[in-house]
Amino acid sequence: ESPGVSGLGILKGKVKRFPSDMGLKIPHIGWNFADIKKPCPIYDGIADGSFVYFVHSYYLDAENRSDVATKTEYGISFDSSVAVPEINLYATQFHPEKSGRVGLKILENFAKLGGDTLVR
């Protein structure tokens, strides 16, 4: 989000602001779909195209397309989550904690990845 400032260096790509010349409301706030692009354990039991809740002005443009787990449309198509299981990395641009039953299922799946035995 800060030009000239390096991120953590875990993922290759660019963080970009939504274009201001497209008439989009920025920040992007509200419900939108997540189009699942690859099998991912945090999306087990989640229907492709499920709606999730966003509040953001920036998005990741991942360099490695195989990292992209979901894409979403908001004036442009953007990477809305990434998954790199080999390094236990799962990241969403949307807010699972604000995404109703779908979000709760995503959080449950994530907890199970860590071996949480209290999850039903």
Model-derived regions, located:
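Cysteine-nucleophile active-site neighborhood
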Residues: 1-29, 108
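Generic recognition of short, well-ordered alpha-helical segments
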Residues: 6, 65, 102-105
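Hydrophobic residues at beta-strand termini and immediately following loops
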Residues: 11, 70-71, 92
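Mobile beta-alpha loop/short-helix "lid" or hinge segments that flank ligand
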Residues: 13-16, 22, 75-84
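Phosphate-binding/catalytic loops
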Residues: 26, 31, 58, 62, ...
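Catalytic beta-strand/loop cores that center a nucleophilic Ser/Cys/Thr
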Residues: 31-83
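Acyltransferase
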Residues: 85-86, 92-120
